[in-house]
Amino acid sequence: MARMIPEFSRHIDKAPPFRKTGNPELDRGRQTEKELYIFLRDLLPDNWVVRYSFEFTRRTDELIEHEADFVVVIPRCGVLVLEVKASESYGLRNGVWYFDPECRHVREGNPFSQARATRFELKRKIQDYMHKSFPGLFGSIVVFPNARRIPGENAAPSSQDPDIIMTGYDLVRDVRNRSLARHLEHTLTLFGDHDLVEIRRSAFNQKEMDAVVRFLEDNYTLEPYRAFTDTYYSHLLDQLTQEQIRLLSSL
């Protein structure tokens, strides 16, 4: 069982990210992510770490906000970002993505471009935190839990590799065969020079993994600070004193 961040072991349906809202589209997405959360938690090894819904900002010329649906930290390997798409069907025609295979309802953005952008920005953010180049492998995969490839058609768009796509059919097979960890690790090994994969894997030792996990834990604490309130009352007293001086001066 993998370590999940955050951890929702009890009453997962009542956890804020998974509560029903009454919005069918939003609730379908929440339900899908909850199901994937449980599969990742229950089927990945104990020494794997999964961060769910990691929101972060990174500043270049401006401050940009990003969110990684799932970040899987794989020991002796690296980090794999999962971009999850909850819709039941997708179509791609002439470079435009649609929500339906008949290609009538346009959706915003290319899911592979989104996964790649999140991967690049998260890698840079972690490197900023570690103050060095990322030591292991760093990859991304697009997950369509509620859809599958149409039999007899291409396994992937001609612009993409089939191994960076995971459909509901793939997930069901991995759940039944207990092969989810092997599948994700294989995908991550594709993101690197073939001759350097083993070197990069060995460089991602326990110390480096612990540093990445600390980053993903995102711990932060603020302590009590009374000076603000004290300054407020001091300000009121000063204002009152000034008012009294003005009144006395007018007598």
Regions found by a protein language model. Give the residues of each.
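Hydrophobic residues on short alpha-helical segments
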Residues: L248-S249
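Intrinsically disordered, low-complexity Ser/Thr/Pro/Gly-rich regulatory segments
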Residues: M1-Q239, I245
